[in-house]
């Protein structure tokens, strides 16, 4: 039990050593430190898991020190382990370790090799703090650490201005969500006097029994933080641009760390959301809308990583849908299985990119199944899991649990949205696979090999099959029991979702293996061009935000840069100067000018006196 802190300390040690090496170490030494620290953290997690199950899945807390103590405000740096945090910890360190191992191969020869692993080690440490925190403020520390590391890693190739812009965009958009989370923190402490998760859930029913609507505002702010970090509507615009970073970073962000943080936040504070059913229903609606919009956007992408990015957005949408219909176990189960097959797909896409000499446009590839058969197999299995192919994939079991939860709790509309999303998922996933690995070879791909390349792919491939679905998160007693669907209804739903997935795959095969001319004619038609452009640009959210927020902000910044307050303070001086110049012109030395001026002045004075009288 006392080993819990090591899951944070070990990656932190790796970060410190790599940071102070300042790139002087060889790639082998940097890889040993960077990969080894996360590997040791994963090993410690395994020991912790064995101990946890040996003690009857008894939750416990490990106080480390008092972080802050100001008057009645006391915040401890305390870690908590229960079934929920153990599941997340296993995903973060386990899948994170496999991604680090792959990255040691992928990043060979890249400038900043040790810097890369320094950032990823800090990323893992921050995520572990977020997962194990027993209070909202400590979670917020890890939350911000994850945001910082994502900025550093997305902009890893900082010499390219586009990468810097993508990193800044991710940083700014997620900061919007972080502000909402900070507001939630302030509201909850002001109302309950504590930020400890267990204490908040215990105190909330009595405190908010009189209909105080501050709890609704607090949960809305929590939802705002979650949608920012997990790239859900309306703060989803950063995720596709985050593909500017190295491919292992994409795998780390999408599978093991950042985007799962928002999903984790809601179950961790589930007691508060259960008291605000309207907000909880909104969580499900946000997820349903996001998964549909992301599915259509993925269908027209040409960049292999952007297809996977939108698929992540869609799958996180399924998790939000599950949370919204109170299918708590299903949401975490899908989070775990998604980590397996999404890490597999991203790492396999990295292999494709390197084999194709850093080409990412899927239409410039083709016929790669012969050149890189292992990667092709990984895409088939990972794509099948993403598409929830029946019985043989982990994704089928976890996604069906979500749809069953929606149906059992009476949210038929959300279940239908989930089925439509499942069809879209299988369609765009196998569109990508058929274009990249079948058809005419357009680029000479070289073979990719190496133990550190193949081993992580093989492990993730196995976990993406039904084997991964055998790992059941120990959530009993941590989250409320999910309403179960009757056996007959469950069987009908499984058959329906399976048929939907298979039909999507068959349609993709018909269109992109046999009828590409039909696809081209549809894409070149007027409606096709209109919808294609709209979906390709993610439904125009970037354009809208640019017009509504970015341009006005830049205009205000341009104005403030010129110090308008100081300019206003100069107005009296400018007026006095002009008045002085005018009076100076009247001093011309001509007597007739002075007589005329006096006469005019006298007439004006007399006129004023008469008017005023």
PLM region descriptions:
Residues 1-9, 25-32, 73-91, 129-142, ...:
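Membrane-entry segments of alpha-helical transmembrane domains in multi-pass membrane proteins
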Residues 2-3, 21-118, 191-212, 237, ...:
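Transmembrane helix-loop-helix hairpins at membrane boundaries of multipass inner-membrane proteins
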Residues 7-23, 97-98, 227, 291:
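N-terminal signal-anchor/start-transfer transmembrane helix
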Residues 36-53, 177-187, 380-387, 456-471, ...:
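Hydrophobic alpha-helical membrane-insertion segments
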Residues 38-47, 185, 292, 498-510:
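Hydrophobic core of alpha-helical transmembrane segments in multi-pass integral membrane proteins
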Residues 72, 477-492, 517-613:
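Aromatic-capped, Gly/Pro-kinked transmembrane alpha-helices
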Residues 90, 94, 98-139, 148-452, ...:
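Hydrophobic transmembrane alpha-helices and their helix-loop junctions in integral membrane proteins
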Residues 443-506:
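Hard-cation-handling environments
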């Amino acid at each position: 039990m006392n080993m819990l802190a090591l899951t944070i300390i070990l990656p932190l040690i790796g970060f410190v050593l790599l940071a102070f090496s300042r790139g002087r170490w060889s790639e082998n030494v940097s890889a040993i430190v960077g990969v080894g620290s996360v590997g040791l953290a994963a090993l410690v997690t395994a020991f912790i898991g064995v101990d946890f199950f040996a003690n009857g899945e008894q939750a416990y807390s490990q106080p480390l020190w008092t972080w802050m103590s100001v008057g009645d405000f006391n915040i401890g740096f305390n870690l908590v382990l229960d079934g929920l945090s153990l599941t997340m910890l296993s995903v973060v360190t386990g899948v994170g370790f496999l991604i680090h191992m792959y990255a040691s191969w992928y990043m060979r020869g890249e400038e900043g090799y040790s810097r890369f692993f320094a950032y990823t080690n800090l990323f893992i440490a921050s995520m572990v703090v977020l997962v194990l925190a027993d209070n909202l403020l400590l979670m917020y520390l890890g939350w911000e650490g994850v945001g910082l590391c994502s900025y550093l890693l997305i902009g890893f190739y900082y010499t390219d201005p586009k990468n810097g812009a993508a990193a800044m965009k991710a940083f700014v958009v997620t900061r919007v969500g972080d502000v909402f989370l900070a507001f939630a923190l302030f509201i909850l402490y002001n109302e309950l006097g504590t930020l400890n998760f267990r204490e908040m859930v215990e105190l909330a029913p009595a405190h908010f029994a009189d209909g105080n609507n501050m709890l609704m505002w607090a949960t809305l702010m929590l939802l705002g933080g979650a949608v920012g970090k997990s790239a859900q509507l309306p703060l989803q615009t950063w995720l596709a641009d985050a593909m500017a970073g190295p491919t292992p970073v994409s795998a780390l962000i999408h599978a093991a760390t950042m985007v799962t943080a928002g999903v984790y936040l809601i179950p961790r504070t589930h007691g508060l959301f259960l008291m605000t059913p309207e907000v909880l229903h909104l969580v499900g609606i946000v997820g349903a809308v996001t998964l549909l919009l992301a599915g259509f956007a993925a269908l027209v992408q040409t960049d292999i990583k952007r297809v996977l990015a939108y698929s992540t957005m869609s799958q996180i949408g399924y998790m939000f849908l599950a949370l919204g219909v109170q299918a708590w176990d299903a949401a975490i189960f899908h989070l775990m299985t998604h980590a397996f097959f999404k890490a597999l797909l991203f790492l396999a896409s990295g292999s494709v990119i390197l084999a194709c000499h850093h080409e990412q446009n899927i239409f410039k590839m083709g016929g790669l199944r012969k050149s890189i058969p292992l990667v092709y197999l990984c895409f088939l299995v990972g794509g099948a899991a993403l598409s929830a192919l029946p019985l043989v994939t982990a994704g089928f079991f976890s996604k069906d649990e979500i749809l069953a939860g929606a149906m059992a709790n009476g949210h038929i509309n959300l279940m239908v949205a989930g089925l439509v999303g499942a069809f879209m998922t299988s369609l765009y996933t196998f569109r990508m696979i058929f274009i990249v690995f079948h058809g005419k070879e357009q680029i000479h791909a070289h073979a990719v090999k190496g133990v550190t390349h193949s081993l992580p792919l093989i492990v993730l491939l196995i976990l993406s099959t039904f084997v991964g679905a055998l790992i059941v998160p120990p959530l009993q007693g941590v989250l409320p029991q999910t309403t179960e669907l009757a056996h007959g209804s469950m069987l009908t739903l499984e058959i329906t979702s399976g048929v939907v997935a298979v039909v999507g795959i068959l349609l993709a095969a018909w269109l992109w293996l046999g009828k590409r001319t039909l696809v081209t004619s549809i894409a070149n038609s007027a409606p096709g061009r209109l919808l294609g452009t709209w979906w390709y640009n993610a439904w125009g959210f970037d354009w809208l935000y640019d017009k509504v927020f970015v341009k006005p902000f830049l205009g205000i910044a341009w104005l403030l840069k010129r110090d308008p307050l100081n300019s206003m303070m100069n107005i009296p001086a400018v007026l006095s100067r002009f008045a002085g110049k005018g009076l100076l012109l009247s001093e011309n030395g001509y007597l007739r000018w002075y007589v005329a001026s006096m006469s005019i002045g006298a007439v004006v004075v007399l006129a004023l006196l008469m008017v005023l009288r």
